Structure formats: structure tokens, C-alpha cells
Amino acid sequence: MTEITVEKLATEVGKTVDRLIEQFAQAGIKKAKADTVSESEKQQLLDFLKKQHGADAQPTKMTLQRKTVSTLSVSSGGGQSKDVKVEVRKKRTFVKRDGNEAALKAEEEARAQAEAQAKAEAEAKAKAEAEAKAKADAEAKAKAKAEAEAKAKASASAAKEQPKPVESEEAKAEAARLKSQQEEAAKSKAAQEEAAAKEKARLLAEENAARWAEEERRRIEAERYGDHHVTTSKVARAAEDSADLDDEKRGRRNRNKTQTKSKRGGKDAREGREKHMKYKSTPESMAHGFNKPVAAVTRDVRIGETVTVAELAQKMAVKATEIIKAMMKMGSMVTINQVLDQETAQLVAEEMGHKVVLLRENELEHQVLADRDDEGTTKLEPRAPVVTIMGHVDHGKTSLLDYIRRTKVAAGEAGGITQHIGAYHVETDNGMITFLDTPGHAAFTAMRARGAKATDIVILVVAADDGVMPQTIEAIQHAKAGNVPLIVAVNKMDKPEADIDRVKNELSQHGVMSEDWGGENMFCYVSAKTGQGVDELLEAILLQAEVLELKAVRDGMAAGVVIESQLDKGRGPVATVLVQEGTLRQGDIVLCGLEYGKIRAMKDENGRPIMEAGPSIPVEILGLSGVPSAGDEATVVRDERKAREVALYRQGKFRDVKLARQQKSKLENMFANMTEGEVQELNIVLKADVQGSLEAITDSLRKLSTDEVKVNIIASGVGALTETDATLAAASNAIMVGFNVRADAQARKTIESEAVDLRYYSVIYDLIDEVKSAMSGMLSPEFKQQIIGLAEVRDVFKSPKLGAIAGCMVIEGIVKRSAPIRVLRENVVIYEGELESLRRFKDDVNEVRNGMECGIGVKNYNDVRVGDQIEVFETIEVARTL
């Protein structure tokens, strides 16, 4: 097969190039990215990986069991014999030596043999060289000496002959000396070579030890951090072998007993064996390669508008109990399914050391509201001012507006007071003005606040004969909070008791100064009855509007605010919308708070149908999916399907947030709720004609609650009283209250059959007063003790039947037989009980009047003395009021 590069091989095996190069290096092969890989190198790498991962691990031990059964005939008494089975068992264990261990041992033996052979060869070689060198030196010396002697002998005249044996002995001695020197040199050289060989062997052993230690360390790291399945398989095999050995030993010990029992017991023994096998010990749990993190893990927790405790725990990767414990430390008791608001969840997550990312889940809402027709946004045109008339009740707000509109609105109001926000537009000679008429009663605070929010100018109506009142002050506060200019209309100037200076003085105490006194507020003096000063008031309004330079976009999609809403029986949900920009047309798709819909019809304040309405025009629209809340923003959008999605999303979010707040309120009021059983509850099902009145009545009724009687509005809504409302009232023992609405036919049947208390009202004063009287009837009555008579003991007689009888003179009031009494001695009560007998001249009587004598027997009391006083009293019930 052709050789391939490292990069291509990494692609084939599915690993990174760096990882493959690292594995080659661990196997002892140095490779670069562009180098080629041969088949032998592949095989070498494969062998290394198998060895590292333990894939080539095979059983190193094998146990063979042999069983031989023979029959032995044994004689018994009576000349008979019986056969006895003899079973011989043999067990042999064969151990397979590890190939690596054998190779290492052979390598060590070969190394030792090589070192010994090298040492012997070195010694023999050194010895032979020394002997040869000594022999050569001896021969050379002997030859030189012989030549010198021959020359000397030839040149000398007379030479003395010397014996040869001496010369040969000297040569031999010299040769022996040289030989010994050579041998010493050879031995020293051999010793040096031996020391070098030992040093080399020591270094090799150290190198091998270091290499084996490194391999052991890598194996341990691989088991700890490496592939979980590889390390687990090794441990599993080892554990399985150990368990098999234990089971086999245990089986050998118990086999004889089990076999005996099985012969005797049959089925029971079989069941015992099965039970034993069922509950036999299992190998210990295998270790895993996961290590518990020692450092705290910080996560980015994404939190929406609402989140449950379980969801928050999942996002933070902790148990829900940890969050519950953390919130208990923070002072809140929660459950696992409880909904938390965004702020609470953020506090908990940050307390537990995580980073919080707040999500904007209303992305669809922003997208829908951004996809609007912006045509002509730069083309601003003047618009009519929106004027809100505020003031105290009965100061003539509606009458003044009635004179301006030349109609009779005030006469048609129930009780002569305004209970709705009336929206009207008036054409004057100088331009159009839109008026919002707000209620003056204290219960309509929210309606006045909405009026100030949607307005450009506030007209504060103050009666010249009444001055500044609580709702006047509240209207001033609303105007200041909304940063709206204020024009003061001093009404009822036709009355003789009108006092302008008093009104100015009282208003100045609340920061409203007239221009005459150096202030910024215009004062107009008007009379709704005669029409005095009305034209000046309109001019002041238009002048203030010119100063404000009120402009709005006339073209494009409309946007406005819901002034009032109601549920009409024939028309369905009806909303009064004040257009603030754009043009509202019939057929537009409107997104209005939690509701949406296509405008089916539009009407002006007089009930006439219209097709479109521009800025600052109040209009009634029909076709919404439900009754919107007053104060909601009404916006025209393109797509009805997306408008429905946004409305449903808002409803879900509103429901979740409301639930979270209710739960929080319940937990915070836990101790207060413990005494709820002692508090009387007045349940009310309330229906009103418009949203504003419903809010006002609900708020006023809840303020009536006391420590002893609580007003509980179990259901409220806009529209007629239905059968569902009647059924709910009957089930909860509630009274039904209708404000300017009536019950339908089905509801009346249910009310009659269930005997539900139904009450209709058209004036809010009457409703509040009657609910207050109903609450008074639910108060527990007070009991008062009233003294009705006093008798003085003049003498004491003994009676065999009644014991001590007191002869008394009635000195005050009446003494009655049925009334309880007290016995007083020196004006201290010593006994309280009841009369047993009351007689006059031996006759039993029911009562004895002042100035008469009588005999009194006190029940269960005989210690009556002369001079004691007997006080007669009765307990009367006193009704309480709020």
C-alpha cells in the first residue's frame, strides 16, 4: 500500500493532526505534519495504543477442574453389599507469563551474559597482549645483549668465557619482570573496563526506571482523565475476575451442604438455590473517571419576566432545594413550583454567585409596534387642546361644561353628580377644544389621574362660596404631577356669598398663585348659571394652547389612550378612545392593552356614527375582543394575527406577574392570615357599567374593611349581572351589587331560586352607605349589665327546705325572680348567682317593687347576714356601628 501523510491519516482516523503527532511521539516516532507514514510505523503506533489502552489484555490465568466419578462396592451387615459413588475432583491453575515480562527478563539475562562475556574477553585479550609484549621485549633484550657481548669479545684480546646458564637465568628473570608488569597493566585496564561497563549498566537501569515510571504515570493519568469506557473496561474485567474467584470459593464450601439439602428437600432446596443466586453478592461499584470540581462554577443565568424555582434551579445547574434554602436565609418561604418575579430571581442568582442576564421577552411586542406606517411623521400640524375639568364634588364642573356645550348633561346624571369621564369636543369661533369631565367624588382618584395624564390643560373649578376642598387639593396635585398648566375657574359668581379673596388665599397656600398676585396661573370668574365669564375662559384656554404650541401628526396610523370602557349588552365591549396622533379609521386593527380587534363601528360623543377621527377627538370604538382597562394605550397595527399574539402574551405576562405578587403577599401576611377565622367577611359580587366606576367602587369598598369585618370582593366586572355571577354569589354566600346595570332573565331566575340578596344602585354614596350598614350588622354585639333593683337584708330566717331566707326591703327599682343577682357586703360583691325563691306574705311572686318587703332565697348560698344588699341586674344587648 502506498504511504500517506500524517495529515491525511489524521483525517481518516478522525483525530486532529496535533493529537496524532503527539501519539506518534509517545510511541517513539518523530513526525511532522507533512511527513509520510509507512505501514511498519502504523503497526508500531497501533501496538503502542493497544498496549496503552489495554486492548491486548488477555486472561493470564486459567483454572481447569476435573471430576472423576467411580463406584465402590462396600459390604454391609447380613452379607449384603451396597454401591457407593466416589467422586474425585481435581483443580489445576495454569498461569500465562506476560510476554513483556519474559522479554524484559530475557533482555536482562542477555545483557548480563553480554557484560560477563565482554569482561572475560577483555581480560583474556589483555593477558595475551601482555604475555606477547613481555616475550618480545625479552627476546629483543637478549639479542641486543648477545650482540654487544659478541662485539666486546671479538675486540678484546683476551676474553673470559662466562657460563651460559647465568646469561639465560638473567634473561629469564628480566622476562618474568616484564611479564609481571604487563599483567599488572592488563589487570588495571580490565578493572577500568569493568567499572565502565558497570556504570553503563547503572545508567541504563536508571533510564529504564525513569521510562517505566513515566509510562506508569501516563497509565494512571489515562485511567483518571482518559476515555471513560477504556478505563472502566479494565476495572470491570478485574472486578469480574475477582467476583468469579470469590463465587467459586464460596460455591466449593457450600456445595456439599447444598447437594445434601437438594437430595433431601427437592423443591425447597431448588428454591433456596435460586434465592441464593438471586441475592448473591455483586462486585463493588466501578470507579469512574469524573472528578468533583473544587472551584465554584459561575454561570450566566438568563432570567425572563417570571421564572419558577424549578426553572431557576435548572438554569443555575443546582438542586431546587439549594435555592429554597437560599431564599429561606433571605427571609422568604417558597415552594419548588412557585413563580418568582424577575427582581427576586435576580437577587437569588446573584446571592448564589452567578451572573444574571435579564431577558426582554417582549421582542414581538416591540417588533409589532415598530412596524407602523411612519408616513408624514415630519409633517406636524396644529391640534386642538385636550382640557380636563377638575374640582371638588358639586362645585359645578359639569354645569359649566353643560353651558359651554349648550346641552343638559348635568340633569341626566344620577344624583346630580358625575360618575364617568365624559369626553366631548366643542367647536368655538377660535377653534376646537376637547373637554374631559372627571368626577369630583373622593372615590374617583384613579379616573382623575388618568384625565390629567391624557390632557394638555387642566381647568380647576372652585366654588366661590365653598372655597378649597379635599378633591380640589387632589386635583392640584394631579396637575403638578403631570406637569400640566393650570387655569382656575372660580364658579358660582352669581351667588351673593361668593368670596374671591378667600378662594385666592386658600389656593395660594397650595402653590396656585393668580397673575394678579404675581403668580403664573390664570384666574377666570364664571357662572355656569348665567354664563358670566365663559367666553373669557375659552379665550384663556386657546391662549394657553397657543403658548404650548400643540402639534401632532395627522396622517399615518393612529395612537391614543382609553378614557373609559364598558360592556354593552347589545354592542359588546365599547371603549372610549382619545386619539392623540394619526387618524383612526373604521376597519383599523387596534391593539389596546390586553385586548385587540378590528374596529367594526365608530361613534362620536353624541352617538352619531363616524368613519374617521383625527388628533384630540374622542371616539367610541366597537369590535374589541374584550373590555380594555381605562388608561391603556390604543395603537393601530398592521397584522391582526400578530396583534392577537401580542395580546395573548400580555395576558400571560400579566397573569404570571399577578400570581407572583399574590403569592408574595400571602407569604408576607402569613401571621395576619392566622387570625382570619376570627374576622367576619362580607362577600360582594360587583358589576358596574363602566371600568372607571368599577375601580372607584372597588377601592372605596375595600377601604371600609376593619379589624372585625372585612369586605371581600370575590368577583367584579363590567356589564350586566349574569347567571354565572348569581351562581357564584349563591355558592359563596355573597350579596350582588349592580351599579347602573341590571340582571338578565337567567340571572333573575337563579337569584329567586337561590334567594340571593340583589341590590341596584345608581349613586355611589348610597352604595357605600348601605354596605357600611351591612357591615355594622355583622359586628358582634356588645353586652351591657343594667341594675334594675336593690334590696336590703333586714333579718334572716331559717327554712328547712330552702336554708337561709333573707327578709328584705326593696329600696330601689324592682326585684324579679328570673333576673340574676349579686350579694354585696359593705359594697363589695361576695357572691353572684340567681334567686331560688321570691315570696311576699307566704305567696310566691314574680317581682316585688320599690318600698315593699319580701323574702329572698339565694340559690346555693346560705351565708346571708343582716345589712347585706342584694343587687338585681339584667344583661342587655347593644348593637354596634362602624
Curated annotation (Swiss-Prot):
<feature type="region of interest" description="G5">
    <location>
        <begin position="527"/>
        <end position="529"/>
    </location>
</feature>
<dbReference type="InterPro" id="IPR036925">
    <property type="entry name" value="TIF_IF2_dom3_sf"/>
</dbReference>
<dbReference type="InterPro" id="IPR006847">
    <property type="entry name" value="IF2_N"/>
</dbReference>
<dbReference type="InterPro" id="IPR044145">
    <property type="entry name" value="IF2_II"/>
</dbReference>
<feature type="region of interest" description="Disordered">
    <location>
        <begin position="67"/>
        <end position="202"/>
    </location>
</feature>
<dbReference type="InterPro" id="IPR027417">
    <property type="entry name" value="P-loop_NTPase"/>
</dbReference>
<dbReference type="Pfam" id="PF03144">
    <property type="entry name" value="GTP_EFTU_D2"/>
</dbReference>
<dbReference type="InterPro" id="IPR023115">
    <property type="entry name" value="TIF_IF2_dom3"/>
</dbReference>
<comment type="similarity">
    <text>Belongs to the TRAFAC class translation factor GTPase superfamily. Classic translation factor GTPase family. IF-2 subfamily.</text>
</comment>
<feature type="region of interest" description="G3">
    <location>
        <begin position="437"/>
        <end position="440"/>
    </location>
</feature>
<dbReference type="GO" id="GO:0005829">
    <property type="term" value="C:cytosol"/>
</dbReference>
<feature type="domain" description="tr-type G">
    <location>
        <begin position="382"/>
        <end position="551"/>
    </location>
</feature>
<feature type="binding site">
    <location>
        <begin position="391"/>
        <end position="398"/>
    </location>
    <ligand>
        <name>GTP</name>
    </ligand>
</feature>
<dbReference type="Pfam" id="PF22042">
    <property type="entry name" value="EF-G_D2"/>
</dbReference>
<protein>
    <recommendedName>
        <fullName>Translation initiation factor IF-2</fullName>
    </recommendedName>
</protein>
<feature type="compositionally biased region" description="Basic residues">
    <location>
        <begin position="251"/>
        <end position="264"/>
    </location>
</feature>
<keyword id="KW-0342">GTP-binding</keyword>
<dbReference type="Pfam" id="PF04760">
    <property type="entry name" value="IF2_N"/>
</dbReference>
<dbReference type="Pfam" id="PF08364">
    <property type="entry name" value="IF2_assoc"/>
</dbReference>
<dbReference type="InterPro" id="IPR053905">
    <property type="entry name" value="EF-G-like_DII"/>
</dbReference>
<dbReference type="InterPro" id="IPR000178">
    <property type="entry name" value="TF_IF2_bacterial-like"/>
</dbReference>
<feature type="binding site">
    <location>
        <begin position="437"/>
        <end position="441"/>
    </location>
    <ligand>
        <name>GTP</name>
    </ligand>
</feature>
<dbReference type="InterPro" id="IPR004161">
    <property type="entry name" value="EFTu-like_2"/>
</dbReference>
<keyword id="KW-0547">Nucleotide-binding</keyword>
<keyword id="KW-0648">Protein biosynthesis</keyword>
<feature type="compositionally biased region" description="Basic and acidic residues">
    <location>
        <begin position="161"/>
        <end position="202"/>
    </location>
</feature>
<dbReference type="InterPro" id="IPR015760">
    <property type="entry name" value="TIF_IF2"/>
</dbReference>
<dbReference type="GO" id="GO:0003743">
    <property type="term" value="F:translation initiation factor activity"/>
</dbReference>
<keyword id="KW-0963">Cytoplasm</keyword>
<dbReference type="InterPro" id="IPR005225">
    <property type="entry name" value="Small_GTP-bd"/>
</dbReference>
<comment type="function">
    <text>One of the essential components for the initiation of protein synthesis. Protects formylmethionyl-tRNA from spontaneous hydrolysis and promotes its binding to the 30S ribosomal subunits. Also involved in the hydrolysis of GTP during the formation of the 70S ribosomal complex.</text>
</comment>
<feature type="region of interest" description="G1">
    <location>
        <begin position="391"/>
        <end position="398"/>
    </location>
</feature>
<dbReference type="InterPro" id="IPR000795">
    <property type="entry name" value="T_Tr_GTP-bd_dom"/>
</dbReference>
<dbReference type="InterPro" id="IPR009061">
    <property type="entry name" value="DNA-bd_dom_put_sf"/>
</dbReference>
<feature type="region of interest" description="Disordered">
    <location>
        <begin position="223"/>
        <end position="278"/>
    </location>
</feature>
<keyword id="KW-0396">Initiation factor</keyword>
<dbReference type="GO" id="GO:0005525">
    <property type="term" value="F:GTP binding"/>
</dbReference>
<feature type="binding site">
    <location>
        <begin position="491"/>
        <end position="494"/>
    </location>
    <ligand>
        <name>GTP</name>
    </ligand>
</feature>
<dbReference type="GO" id="GO:0003924">
    <property type="term" value="F:GTPase activity"/>
</dbReference>
<feature type="compositionally biased region" description="Basic and acidic residues">
    <location>
        <begin position="265"/>
        <end position="274"/>
    </location>
</feature>
<feature type="region of interest" description="G2">
    <location>
        <begin position="416"/>
        <end position="420"/>
    </location>
</feature>
<feature type="compositionally biased region" description="Basic and acidic residues">
    <location>
        <begin position="95"/>
        <end position="152"/>
    </location>
</feature>
